[in-house]
């Protein structure tokens, strides 16, 4: 057991990830100094000086661990003795199958736990630079990282490694795409760095379908930017609904252009417009809608995007969005244990690494804390298996990405936990008979979660053995 006179691990940022990392490290017997600028300096979104303040919703989403990916992540984090999950459970409010919390009670519980821990010191101050004489650091400053610290991070990581605007296109589960309508083909059959000439899925629209789609976009309900998100649009990242409003033909000369594509199902008929889907992960279980960043309300996205031929039954792993964010190009600059490759004493955690959501941010904080603690004790960090929710999310951040056809660099966008991040599992059957589609989907999810919990328990056992 160390004491407060031992060399501490410095954690910058008192949000969900920073608090979880602090707890995991302190619980392993290592002193922590947690730096939080509030209330000395307020952010554009926070209202209080409490640690782990919930800025937006009070929901941690579904708590169903057998058929829901985020519910599975809840359970894995509970198994790993997560402070955030303990505080959420202690402050839960009625919300059906979801885990929702009293936001004030939740933040106070987390704050009290950290303030009362004998190995945690909380310093209310803004960190504007990354000190060279701190040997162990975790940066968990979230999507609203202060400008001076963001500049310091850019200096260390390189200017292209930090994004300030989050353009997200919807992502679709591959097995929900109608392959009787869609076909594989790259435009003009071009082969990219890791391509085959058939790297995109294509959804054809005739003139009538295209015009109805454009009109639906123009009439749809949009989500407005929050005050602290008001960043001007730039032409390379226009929401599709904004493009639709610029003219009827704008989209078919932009992301929906049909040139260089031939419908494999009907080669003699030229599509009037085409929506392209691009593989989003190495597993091939997810495809994103190319150029479809949007601020449409979620319900509108589902309704309108299912108008696209081939996507009439599409299931979405993530819906689109366009908002201010601060996140790293993590697959390029971080190693498997969330360390900056060029400065191994510096780790990143939470939303700044490229995860989305309260639970996901907390989970990456948990892993960063455990990895840092293992190294401090001169042990090799034990990575969670890819078959666990923790491992699948970590893999998304540090390596589960494909090379961008145009730039040759790994493409990377923030992501919530979803079943598309997990390795596939064999189709479920019952007594040798194949299940109906709906039952098959349910059985598949149950098989993935059962496998995940078994491997998570074994991972935690192995991690304990690693400490000996």
Curated annotation (Swiss-Prot):
The answer to whether keyword Ribonucleoprotein applies is no
Main location as per UniProt: cytoplasm
Keyword tRNA processing present in the record's keywords: the answer is yes
Compartments where located: Cytoplasm
Q: What is its EC number?
A: 2.1.1.74
Q: Which UniProt keywords apply?
A: Cytoplasm, FAD, Flavoprotein, Methyltransferase, NAD, NADP, Transferase, tRNA processing
- One example GO MF annotation: flavin adenine dinucleotide binding
* Residues engaged in binding FAD: 13-18
Reactions that this protein is recorded to catalyse: uridine(54) in tRNA + (6R)-5,10-methylene-5,6,7,8-tetrahydrofolate + NADH + H(+) = 5-methyluridine(54) in tRNA + (6S)-5,6,7,8-tetrahydrofolate + NAD(+); uridine(54) in tRNA + (6R)-5,10-methylene-5,6,7,8-tetrahydrofolate + NADPH + H(+) = 5-methyluridine(54) in tRNA + (6S)-5,6,7,8-tetrahydrofolate + NADP(+)
Which GO cellular component term is one of those annotated?
A: cytosol
Tell me which cofactor or cofactors this protein depends on: FAD
GO BP of this protein = tRNA methylation; tRNA wobble uridine modification
PROSITE patterns recorded for this chain?
GIDA_2 (PS01281)
The Swiss-Prot or TrEMBL record describes its family as follows: Belongs to the MnmG family. TrmFO subfamily.
Describe the function of this protein.
Catalyzes the folate-dependent formation of 5-methyl-uridine at position 54 (M-5-U54) in all tRNAs.
NCBIfam families registered for this protein in UniProt: gid_trmFO, PRK05335.1
Q: What is this protein called?
A: Methylenetetrahydrofolate--tRNA-(uracil-5-)-methyltransferase TrmFO
Gene name for this UniProt entry:
trmFO
């Amino acid at each position: 057991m160390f004491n407060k006179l031992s060399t501490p691990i410095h954690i910058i940022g008192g949000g969900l990830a920073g608090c979880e990392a602090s707890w995991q490290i302190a619980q392993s017997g290592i002193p922590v100094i947690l730096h939080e600028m509030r209330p000395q300096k307020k952010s554009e979104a926070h209202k209080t000086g409490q640690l782990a303040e919930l800025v937006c919703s009070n929901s941690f989403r579904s708590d169903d661990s057998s058929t829901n990916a985020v519910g599975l992540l809840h359970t894995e984090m509970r198994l790993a003795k997560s402070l955030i999950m303990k505080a959420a459970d202690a402050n839960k409010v009625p919300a059906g199958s979801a885990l929702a919390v009293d936001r004030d009670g939740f933040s106070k519980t987390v704050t009290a736990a950290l303030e009362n821990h004998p190995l945690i010191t909380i310093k209310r101050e803004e960190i504007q630079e990354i000190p060279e004489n701190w040997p162990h650091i975790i940066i968990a400053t979230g999507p609203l990282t202060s400008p001076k610290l963001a500049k310091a991070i850019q200096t260390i990581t390189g200017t292209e490694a930090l994004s300030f605007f989050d353009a997200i296109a919807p992502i679709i589960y591959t097995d929900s795409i109608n392959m009787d309508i869609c076909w594989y083909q790259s435009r003009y059959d071009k082969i990219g760095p890791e391509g085959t000439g058939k790297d995109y899925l294509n959804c054809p629209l005739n003139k009538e379908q295209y015009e109805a789609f454009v009109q639906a976009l123009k009439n749809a309900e949009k989500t407005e930017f929050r005050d602290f998100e008001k960043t001007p649009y730039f032409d390379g990242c226009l929401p599709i609904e904004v493009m639709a409003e610029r003219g009827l033909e704008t989209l078919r000369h932009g992301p929906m252009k049909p040139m260089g594509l031939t419908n494999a199902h009907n080669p003699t008929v030229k599509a009037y417009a085409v929506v392209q889907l691009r593989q989003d992960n190495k597993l091939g279980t997810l495809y994103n809608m190319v150029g479809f960043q949007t601020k449409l309300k979620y319900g509108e996205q589902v309704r309108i995007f299912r108008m696209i031929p081939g996507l009439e039954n599409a299931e979405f792993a993530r819906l689109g969005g366009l908002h201010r964010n601060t996140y790293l190009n993590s697959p390029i600059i971080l190693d498997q244990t969330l360390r900056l490759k060029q400065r191994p004493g510096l780790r990143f955690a939470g939303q700044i690494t490229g995860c989305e959501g309260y639970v996901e941010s907390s989970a990456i904080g948990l892993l960063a804390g455990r990895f840092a603690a293992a190294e401090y004790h001169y042990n090799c960090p034990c990575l969670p298996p890819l078959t666990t929710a923790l491992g699948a999310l970590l893999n998304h951040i540090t390596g589960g990405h494909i090379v961008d056809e145009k730039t040759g660099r790994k493409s990377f966008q923030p992501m919530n936990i979803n079943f598309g991040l997990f390795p596939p599992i064999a189709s479920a059957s019952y007594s040798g008979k194949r299940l109906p589609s709906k039952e098959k989907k349910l059985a598949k999810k149950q098989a993935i979660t059962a496998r995940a919990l078994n491997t998570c328990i074994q991972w935690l056992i192995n991690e304990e053995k690693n400490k000996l």
